Amino acid sequence: RLAELEQDTVMATWRTHHRAAYDHAVDMLLSPDVLNMVAADYENLGYVGETANKKLMYLAATSRIMADPLSVIIKSSSAAGKSKLVKATAELMPADQVEDLSRVSKKALFNMERDALSHKLVIVMEKAGADDADYSIRTLITEKTLTSRVTMMSADGPRSELRVVEGPVSYVTTTIDKVDEQLINRVLFLRVDESEAQTARIHEAQRAARTTQGLER
């Protein structure tokens, strides 16, 4: 009972210090219009248009807490906004639930701590940075875990040790190139809007951000 009271006190203190954020989160959870509210949050972060992609990205990122999360590859030409979409999505997630990487070597994921990736949003901003780790990424997405046998030295000499890295994860990356079929069959494939209308929306948002009102947001 004492532990329950202490937990209630901690939660009450948190709500007091984070009242606005707490109220906003509750409003979103109770709203039938929650996905449009999410899209509006993207707008507040400077990512305009792309309503469907914003909703899909948010759902994929939050699916990390589920048993079978979604993973995403975003494809577009260079400088079309795919990285901006990923960064905005990461900003809407708890910082400690995001593993944001520039490069992943062949054995890097196998050598992580057992729970380091469990139910995390794993981002590799450009797929080329993880080409060496394609096998481990595919396995983690599909099997929800990585296992390997490594040789460790002990006082009695070398011994074999089983290493386990547990998922599942929601994996997100971007590319301008053709995607390997073995990976594309495991992910949600999105294309960024490169239309003239979307370009105009971006330019308008950039101009608005330079106004006094935009700088005060």
Which positions does each model-derived feature cover?
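Substrate-gripping "pore-loop 1 plus following alpha2 helix"
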Residues: 103-108, 135-167, 211-214
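Modules that initiate DNA replication and primer synthesis
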Residues: 1-4
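Phosphate-sensing "switch" segment of ASCE/P-loop ATPases
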Residues: 19, 162-169, 176-217
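P-loop NTPase catalytic core of nucleic-acid-dependent motor ATPases
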Residues: 11-102
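Pre-Walker A (Motif I) flank of P-loop NTPase domains
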Residues: 67-72, 118-120, 168-169
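A generic local secondary-structure boundary/capping motif
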Residues: 45, 111-112, 159-163, 175-179
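AAA+/P-loop NTPase substrate/partner-engagement loops
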Residues: 75-80, 87-133, 196
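Conserved AAA+/SF3 P-loop NTPase catalytic/coupling segment centered on the Walker-B
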Residues: 119-149, 175-186
